[in-house]
UniProtKB/Swiss-Prot annotation:
Organism: Clostridium tetani (strain Massachusetts / E88)
Alphabetical keyword list: Carbohydrate metabolism, Hydrolase
Protein name: Glucosamine-6-phosphate deaminase
GO MF annotation list: glucosamine-6-phosphate deaminase activity; identical protein binding
Top EC group: hydrolase
Gene that specifies this protein: nagB
Length: 241
């Protein structure tokens, strides 16, 4: 695991965006794994800026999102489909037919999960996976547990995750209690992984991630086992390492 510490969030976002630009330049039809939440927003804003300057072409790019809340339709302002369209896809020339996001309203979740993993495999796998980390160490919605699911699956959200995500909703009670997420195995298949972490609020979990043991109790720690993973931190997130 390679660790980069940048001075601030803007620099962190710039480094991540340039990694994506370099990949698209080398492989215009690359497959990106994308994350939601507040951390990657700066990276997406940088990508939009580069697109508007004519420095990147997304027309052949395919993307797969990590997760989606169970029970929210794609028009709900807190669904991850809405987030991705509003934050990135509507502002670049990516073909929406090549943007894949799990269906939180699927009547057959097991089938939805199996088919999602098949779609990734049929596209040749993910070239670059962007990740954030939860305050309890989750990646995607792979929550701390005695054991972790390998493939895409339905999961119940931990109390801390619901509380952390309540800032995006009007109240904690509105936060869905379940989500569909790519599994640890699905994530680890990516040829390259970039984990973005910013802010003092993440400093404690960063200490566990970097200095602790590999454990399913800190799902992100399994990234130590990936052959090509880079963690990009700002100084606030890195204060305890």
């Amino acid at each position: 695991m390679k660790v980069l510490i940048k001075d601030n969030y803007d620099e962190l976002s710039e480094v991540a965006a340039l990694e994506i630009l370099e990949l698209i330049d080398k492989k215009p039809d690359c497959v990106l794994g994308l994350a939601t939440g507040s951390t990657p927003v700066g990276t997406y804003q940088k990508l939009i800026e580069y697109y508007k300057k004519g420095k990147v072409d997304f027309s052949k790019v395919t993307s797969f999102n990590l997760d989606e809340y169970r029970g929210l339709n794609g028009e709900h302002p807190q669904s991850y489909k809405f987030f991705m369209n509003n934050t990135l896809f509507n502002h670049i020339n990516i073909d929406k037919k090549n943007t894949f996001i799990l269906d939180g309203l699927s009547n057959d979740i097991e089938k939805e999960c199996i088919e999602y993993d098949k779609k990734i495999d049929n596209k040749g796998g993910i070239d670059l996976q962007i990740l954030g980390i939860g305050g309890n160490g989750h990646i995607g919605f792979n929550e701390p547990s005695e054991e972790l699911s390998i493939s895409t699956h339905l999961t119940k959200l931990k109390t801390k995750t619901i509380k952390d995500n309540s800032r995006f909703f009007n109240s904690e009670e509105e936060v869905p209690t379940e989500a569909i997420t790519m599994g640890i195995g699905s994530i680890m298949k990516a040829r390259k992984i970039i984990l973005l972490i910013n802010g003092e609020v993440k400093a404690e979990i960063v200490k566990k991630l970097i200095n602790g043991n590999v454990s399913t109790k800190v799902p992100a720690s399994l990234l130590h086992l990936h052959p090509n993973c880079t963690v990009i931190l700002d100084k606030e997130a890195a204060k305890f390492i």
